[in-house]
Regions:
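Metal-dependent C-N hydrolase catalytic cores
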Residues: 2-147
C-alpha cells in the first residue's frame, strides 16, 4: 500500500472557528506541543464509496458544536469535580482537527489516522478522539506501538 500524500494529516473542523471547547487549533502535527490532543476521525474504513459519507461522519463536528453547551470554557465551575475543568493546572489542550479523507484514496484513511495518532503519542501527549464509525479505535490502538 503506498503511503498517504505529504499534505497535512489533519484539517480544521468543518465549521470555521469551532474547536472543542474553544481550545486552540493546531493542525501542524510536526510541530505539535500539548499535553492533550482532541482529534476527529470522521470516516472509518468503508467497504464501498456509498459508505464514505453518512450521518456518523458528522459526529466530530456535532460534538464540537455541542461542547459550547456543555461547558463555557476551562474557567467554568464543574460541579461533578468540584473545581474548574483543569483545576488551575498547567495543562495544554489543543484541537488538532479532523483526519483528512480523500475519496480517491479511501484505503489510506486509516493509515492517516494511525499516523496522526502516532505523532500525538510520540510526544507523550494523551489523545481524545471523536469518531466516525465503530472502526475508529483501530488505527488509534495500532498507533500505541510508539509507546
Amino acid at each position: 500500500m503506498p503511503a498517504p500524500s505529504k499534505k497535512t494529516l489533519t484539517k480544521p473542523p468543518r465549521r470555521v472557528f469551532q474547536t472543542f471547547m474553544d481550545f486552540p487549533l493546531s493542525t501542524d502535527m510536526d510541530a505539535f506541543d500539548a499535553d492533550i490532543a482532541i482529534m476527529g476521525i470522521p470516516h472509518g474504513d468503508p467497504y464501498n464509496i456509498d459508505e464514505v459519507t453518512n450521518d456518523q461522519t458528522n459526529a466530530p463536528t456535532a460534538i464540537r458544536q455541542a461542547s459550547d453547551q456543555l461547558i463555557m470554557g476551562s474557567k467554568h465551575w464543574d460541579f461533578d469535580i468540584d473545581s474548574t475543568l483543569l483545576n488551575g493546572r498547567d495543562i495544554k489542550v489543543v484541537d488538532v482537527g479532523d483526519v483528512r479523507a480523500d475519496a480517491r484514496e479511501l484505503s489510506h484513511h486509516y493509515q492517516r489516522a494511525e499516523e496522526a495518532a502516532r505523532k500525538v503519542f510520540s510526544t507523550g501527549a494523551s489523545l481524545i478522539t471523536f469518531g466516525g464509525d465503530h472502526g475508529v479505535p483501530i488505527p488509534v490502538m495500532r498507533a500505541l506501538d510508539v509507546l
